[in-house]
Amino acid sequence: MAGSTAGYGQIIEYIQDKLYLASYDHTPDAKTPFPYPAEQPKSPSKRRAQASPSKKRSPVYFTVDDTLLYNSFHADFGPLHIGHLYRFAVHFHDLLAANNDRAIVFYSRTDARSRANAACLVACYMVLIQSWPPHLALAPIAQADPPYMPFRDAGYSQADFILNIQDVVYGVWKAKEQGVCGLRDFSLEEYEKFERVDMGDFNWISPHFLAFASPQHQPVAPIPRDSPEYAALPSTVSEVRSSRLPLPFKNVLEHFATRGVGLVVRLNSELYSPSYFTALGISHIDMIFEDGTCPPLPLVKKFIRMAHEMINVKHKAIAVHCKAGLGRTGCLIGAYLIYRYGFTANEVIAFMRFMRPGMVVGPQQHWLHLNQGSFREWWFEDCMKEKLAQMQPNPVTPGRSPAKHRAAAVTTPPQNGHSKRSALGEIDNNEATPIYDDNLPAPTPGQPRKSHRKDSRHHPYSRTASGSLVVDKDTRKTRRSTDSSESEEETQLRMLAKQRSSKSPAASPGQRSISYSATVTASYTLNDDIHEDRENWGGAAQPPKTPVTSKTSGAVSVSKVRSSSRRVTGESKGVRKPSGRIGSTGSPVRVKAQA
């Protein structure tokens, strides 16, 4: 519910008589108009029953525009992170306790960025702390006028991918429902300390993933394990604290050793020696790809497999970093969160920025959006493999198989053993063998074209692979002996006369009667002369009549078809469909004729 006062903008009610959201271009005071609660019309009553009107107390106003500041990278302005939400909640609860009988108005300045951050902060508070469902948290601000400004990435290029408040709210809600985010074990002091560049620049994205910027320390080459230099590396937390390493690197090593980090994944070029991590018993692996680019899918799948094993088998956390711990780091962590918990791309980007501002930059946003389906597909495949493995009984040693089974045993094909699909190959073989997408040409623009060949990949109901005609013996014999000037209709009439002349009153005991049907595929071509198909016009007055069969043992149904000079050729055109309907050009039409 939203109220408004002239010249003061819109005031949105979140909790009746408790919390309101507003924006002012000046600091509000007791004289600022406040439309809640709305005055109810009074019913007529006796004078002695009228009570003296109670004085309505003015609400309490507070803002965080000058206290909770977003540290932007370039043109980004939000959303505010989880530390801001924690401080907002503490301050709001203090105001509620001190003003039990007064409404509280959380307001911001009237500029678009301040309004968006304030509304997003309140909606996330309702979801994460008050446990509201997302639709209820979004309902009060859904029809805000003017609408709230969407958020953008931290890159230096023009923003071409946006996130709105709904994405942030649903991302936070999904993380809470999956146990990925919560304030029960959240330490504000630790969060605000280690997010600073001079203190390590790292944040926990989830209980199993930590994102951090690359430490920088010389030398950068790995130190051999059997060398004296490796033995001198700090191997305990106390040795790390007493070492002469830079403070950010020291904080990283100490925090990782005490918080159960089991794997460090480096995505950028070498700026430190990995031996400092391995000396503490922390595995280290390089999965380097170019800054600002998107990782190849095989690398992503390898990362997901390693991370899943580290989390579920070794019960350790994973720390991922690139140069700044934002773009490339967000790609891999976001891919795993989509894979495991079913985030959408917008939700996971918004949630990661809620935990560590600036994550996922530029085209990496589109990359996550385009590949989110593949990540979920990998999860379903892995779950199905696990279920099938559990359902499979204990393996039994097989006995000696017969010779015919051994001869038909399936062997592993050689590398690239399948035949390449040529541009002009055998029709039947191309359809009988599986199609390898890697060998197909790239899709070309334009509309698909109809083809005379029935492709079993697109027409699964075709009866023969090559679309060949199947006709009876009499028809083939007649076609071979037919003169080039004889039309198809004359051939059918001559066959009918032959069958009538050969009828007998009783079946011969030495002969057997065979009834069979022939499937004929006929292709019709529409001529340019529209007057030759007058019976197929939509405005035809009379529908085609059902042909009457003769009362003989060898009856054949034949429809009356007008002869055309253009159809009198030596080439066989198949059997004309009795219904008078003509299939479109290039689309075979099957006609079932009773012989």
From Swiss-Prot:
Transmembrane segments: none annotated. Residues 44-57, 449-461 have a biased composition (Basic residues). Residues 502-526 have a biased composition (Polar residues). The active site is at 322 (phosphocysteine intermediate). SMART domains: DSPc (SM00195), PTPc_motif (SM00404). This is Tyrosine-protein phosphatase cdcA. The keyword Nucleus applies. Protein phosphatase which antagonizes mitotic cyclin-dependent kinase nimX, the inactivation of which is essential for exit from mitosis. To access its substrates, is released from nucleolar sequestration during mitosis. Plays an essential in coordinating the nuclear division cycle with cytokinesis through the cytokinesis checkpoint. Involved in chromosome segregation, where it is required for meiosis I spindle dissambly as well as for establishing two consecutive chromosome segregation phases. Belongs to the protein-tyrosine phosphatase family. Non-receptor class CDC14 subfamily. Keywords: Cell cycle, Cell division, Cytoplasm, Hydrolase, Meiosis, Mitosis, Nucleus, Phosphoprotein, Protein phosphatase. Its EC number is 3.1.3.48.
